[in-house]
Amino acid sequence: MDISIINEVFSTLEEKSMNVVSNFEFNLSKISTGRANPQLIKNIKVSYYEELIPLEQISNISVPEPQQLLIKPFDHNITKEIHKSLLLANLDVAIVNEGNQIRLNFPALNTQRRKELVKSLNKFTEQARVSIRLLRQESNKKIKSFKSEISEDDIKKYETKIQTINDSYIEQIDEITKRKERELMEI
């Protein structure tokens, strides 16, 4: 049995697990903590010369105050289009079009809204955990497919290693969740 095939299973598991964690972090960055965060809007698509362009490519997004974002378009003629795209995004923020720039004012989160956000955070967390577990199952199946070529002891050893990798990524997801939950519950 060529050990490189087994190593390929482990490296694929690691790579896919890292992608799950990265996507999880990206999805969490979209959850508003009551503080202005450019991540919330940077990928909103704006119609610009009949093409849909991410907001971050056609404007400068800054945080002048903790609960405010300021969008300064590079081309002032598209301010109305940006405003329209922001309205369509249903951001739950006050949008003020000042002519050549747009301000987004984020309301302070009340306790009820914080609890709702923690619930949605928990949904994202569970989805990420399930994805990691599915990757574990996939890797275990690949290892078992070699059972005619490797011993039962080796299969158990490889499954244990897969479980260890799985546990480390679940732990990362849980840490990220705890951090985000603390941010959400901070007043």
Curated annotation (Swiss-Prot):
Tell me which UniProt keywords the record has, alphabetically. Answer: Cytoplasm, Protein biosynthesis
Q: In terms of one coarse class, where is the protein primarily found? A: cytoplasm
Record's subcellular location: Cytoplasm
Q: Which GO terms describe its biological process?
A: translational termination
Task: Spell out the molecular function terms from Gene Ontology.
Answer: ribosomal large subunit binding
Please indicate if the UniProt record lists Protein biosynthesis as a keyword.
yes
Q: Which InterPro entries match?
A: Ribosome_recyc_fac (IPR002661), Ribosome_recyc_fac_dom (IPR023584), RRF_sf (IPR036191)
Gene3D superfamilies in UniProt: 3.30.1360.40, Ribosome-recycling factor
Domain of life where this protein originates: Bacteria
Q: Name one GO cellular component term.
A: cytoplasm
- Protein family membership: Belongs to the RRF family.
| The protein's role, per its UniProt record | Responsible for the release of ribosomes from messenger RNA at the termination of protein biosynthesis. May increase the efficiency of translation by recycling ribosomes from one round of translation to another.
The record's annotation in HAMAP family points to: RRF
Name of the protein: Ribosome-recycling factor
- Annotated organism of origin: Mycoplasmopsis pulmonis (strain UAB CTIP) (Mycoplasma pulmonis)
